[in-house]
Regions:
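Terminal, low-structured helical/coil segments at or just beyond the last alpha-helical repeat
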Residues: 25-37, 147-181
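Alpha-helical segment of the N-proximal tetratricopeptide repeat
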Residues: 38-69, 79, 83
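Conserved structural position within tetratricopeptide repeats
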Residues: 64-65, 95-99, 129-133, 162
Length: 181
């Protein structure tokens, strides 16, 4: 009676060994060529641009299996989640990224956008200030910080305008026009 079980078990083991691995990151233009770990980020970038999100995530995961400390792939994962329309996952990924790679300013800049979108301008300011401390010449972070200051000014002007200040109302109108860009 044990023999049929062993035969079945042996057959299953053999069958699973014959099934190819579930995924292999391959060259997008030449699928017969497997990508090396340092080629995967470029392929992921292209896949995200082409909106092939499932394949991009598979490439990221495979790349992280080969190189678990790849800052580029971990960052791309947050970019992928944002592109896919999963901002909560993107934000979690960025928070995790900052804990692992606190020296990379782009993560602070991207995370600040989420804080700003929630209206948490103080947190956005903290994150952007950190990005600028890491790289003082980071123009995008500086511009985003200026936008945070403008949004805070708009909030203050709204309160003043509701209180009856005509000059605050005029400034608010001008500022809102400026913020449309």
């Amino acid at each position: 009676m044990k023999r049929p079980f062993l035969t079945l078990f042996s057959a299953l083991v053999l069958a699973s060994a014959l099934v190819p691995t579930t995924y292999a990151a391959v060259d997008l233009d030449n699928p017969s060529v497997k990508l090396s770990p340092d080629q995967i980020p470029s392929a992921v970038e292209r896949l995200i641009r082409e909106k092939k999100f499932d394949t991009a995530l598979e490439y990221i995961n495979e790349g992280l299996e080969q190189n678990p400390i790849s800052a580029q792939l971990k960052f791309q994962k947050s970019v992928l989640y944002e592109a896919e329309g999963w901002p909560d996952l993107a934000q979690k990924e960025l928070e995790s990224f900052i804990k692992t790679f606190p020296e990379i300013p782009e993560a602070y800049n991207n995370l600040a956008r989420y804080a700003s979108n929630r209206g948490d301008y103080k947190r956005a300011e903290e994150l952007l200030t950190q990005a600028l401390a890491l790289r003082p010449g980071y123009t995008t972070a500086r511009e985003n910080l200026a936008n945070v200051y403008l949004a805070e000014a708009a909030q203050a002007l709204k309160v003043a305008a509701k209180g009856g200040s005509r000059s605050a109302a005029r400034r608010l109108t001008a500022l809102e026009e400026l913020l449309k860009d």
